[in-house]
Amino acid sequence: RLAAMVDEGGAIMEGTISGVNEPVALIGTAEKGHLSLKLRAEGTPGHSSMPGKDMAIGRLARALTRLDANPQPVRLKALKDLINNLGSAVSFGMQFVFSNIWFFRPIIKMQAEANSTTNAMIRTSTALTMVNGGIKENVLPANAEAIVNFRLLPGDSIAKVCDRVRKIIKDDKVEFEPVAGGAWEASQVSSTDTKSYLILKHTIRKVFDGVV
């Protein structure tokens, strides 16, 4: 069975985690899932000189705005595990905060969301990546399409994300489906209590001076 994989993944972060002064080398213990959804909105076609209220681009824009304003739910387990693995490199104050997540959850959430790296660690991410609608400036298109890309946190699932998307959009005239070849579930989380993990951890510390 494969013990570990070394590729271009991971990073050395500086100043990203509050309460940690040293650079932090990230060792991936899981792989996020992937889901690209194609959204398609239908509307009444026509001429721009006489626009109606049922415009495809407007309907699609409202759906995308709702998805952008309502990110997927927060789960702090991965961030808590990271803090625990950093041990004494984490300030006492931050250790206290993460030992009492039940009380400090709103503060942790606010700080994590302020940084794109830590925000991606606490939730399934939502990215609006492609939009297509209309072929001429004075023509109302009959439909408009967009691609929204999600990176699934381990423990989340394609079915759960699709269900949330449906509830967030709340518009039966906006259909969506996974892009062909663009959907796979997140992996399971590997244990850090293994010989291969410890070897990798000690090797990184020898190669990159001063990292934790």
Locations of regions flagged by a protein language model:
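Metal-dependent amide/peptide-bond hydrolase catalytic core
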Residues: 10-30, 34-212
